[in-house]
A protein has these predicted regions:
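Acidic, proline/glycine-rich low-complexity IDRs
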Residues: 1-219
Length: 219
């Protein structure tokens, strides 16, 4: 697309090329599926002075039995001529999360968790890359849950590949829950992240977060 073509399209107030690009990428994995979408309150969004940096979340039903959550807000979503032709679209990634859940309401906590990660990145200006990990201060990543999953590990999404957009590269960074024991071992030796991912994939190829998991994959 040329800059002239972009300017013409941008005359439409609803033009959101970044948003459309994300949906198109997921349509490859989930053809003809209409995901459940949750938008954040306009007044709460950072662009209007609020603290919400994620504008919305979509939840897809995977044929493999899990819910697949994607954020909208870590990359450039709307018409912005200054962002046109960039190397990376804003932070260069959107966040994903996979969860075994019966209903979309069961995914609300995960969306809130991703929202907090978004706030962390925007406020601290500290982004995530595959292999990065973070503790939830030793507490379950789902508030109030009886779970050994107290930290997260970032990986490339196991199902949806990154894309090149008019604003630059957009990767899909998946977060998977890990135990306190695994987190402590990664702190001692971050290079073990690759071993952990490979071990987890043997039982869980899509790296779906299981809050009931007690097994440690690093010993």
């Amino acid at each position: 697309m040329t800059i002239e073509e972009f300017r013409e399209k941008a005359k439409d107030e609803e033009y959101a090329p970044g948003w459309d690009a994300i949906e198109d990428a997921f349509a490859v994995c989930y053809p003809e599926q209409n995901p459940n979408h949750y938008g954040t309150n306009f007044e709460a969004r950072a662009m209007f002075g609020g603290s919400e940096y994620i504008d919305g979340y979509s939840i897809y039903q995977s044929p493999h039995g899990h819910k697949h959550i994607i954020t909208f807000g870590m990359t450039e979503l709307y018409a912005d001529e200054e962002a046109f032709g960039g190397k990376y679209s804003r932070w260069g990634y959107e966040m994903t999360f996979k969860l075994k859940a019966d209903t979309t309401d069961d995914c609300m906590w995960a969306m809130n968790f991703l929202g907090n990660l978004g706030i962390y990145t925007y406020v601290k200006e500290s982004w995530f890359e595959p292999g990065h990990f973070m503790s939830n201060m030793g507490k379950p990543i789902k508030t109030g849950a009886d779970s050994m999953i107290t930290a997260i590990l970032a990986v490339d999404d196991t199902e949806v590949s990154g894309i090149d957009t008019i604003y630059g590269r957009v990767d899909f960074l998946q977060f998977v829950g890990i135990t306190s024991e695994e987190y402590e071992m990664l702190k001692e030796d971050p290079s073990k992240a690759k071993l952990l991912i490979e071990a987890m994939k043997k039982d869980n190829p899509y790296l779906v977060t299981d809050l009931g998991r007690k097994k440690s994959y690093l010993v």
